[in-house]
């Protein structure tokens, strides 16, 4: 990706419309550095994807001082997607200029205590307000960030779907590296936990919301015969202890199961005519399997095999460029995709493809698309230049 260093320690990528920049999270004033790198532009919305190594409270409070005329939203990550592809220990800023974008925020303060109908009503009201603000703009999407340890993604996306209408939604579950202890969101200077934020965005720029994974189902199936759905725990598969049976199906010793195993041998469930990934997070001390997304007794799990990750990603990016390359792709990429890339020693190649195609965003604990919460997937929005764009900066 074309990039240049600004008058600070931050690096700005160089799309024509959406502004993006990144900085090492340990510099003295990362938010100010990011602002300088983004340039003197009137932003309606600024997104911050923040390494868990950063001081999140300082980032949040500083963000409303520096970007005081903008809506500022963000979250902690399981890694960042910046100008060079995969990154750790950085902060990525994505600025949406007011000349081409309008945004409103829908905030869910407590994922354990919200009224679904009120949420739906607020989504509809927000969309109507954006339509009144810029009635001549034709394109809309919703971007969701949610606490990645809340185990509430499935319920929230199902509830939000009732208020979407024709407007697509995508998003990602906030991360904490590979520690899995605490994740945070940022909403206009406040730090939130067990919460979610939806950015409702209307734009003059054509957009395409997409979902991509490189997995194909095999004929090997397993049935969940014992589970605690609220905790996303499976204790029995095929009437056998869960971890032991999963290992047997793979031809492995249960003691060998680790994050690399789960990334290389995911399971999928069939919903309608599509398969969706249900990734395993870890093996509990008692041999239960902990999942990243919804699981229940009676669910049929199908073992999946990966296609060539590099070639598949190239093809997906090429498909998004038919008719013209995107200005920017805002993306949520599952942590397990990065783990797989590292394991197969192709992380550099994947990073090169992401950078070449101007993909920015973060590595997640899960991904959302419309009413679905999924795993081991890349979701995002490709943003294209309008035919008669007013360039910024």
PLM features: what roles do these ranges have?
Residues 2-393:
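Hydrophobic alpha/beta core scaffold segments
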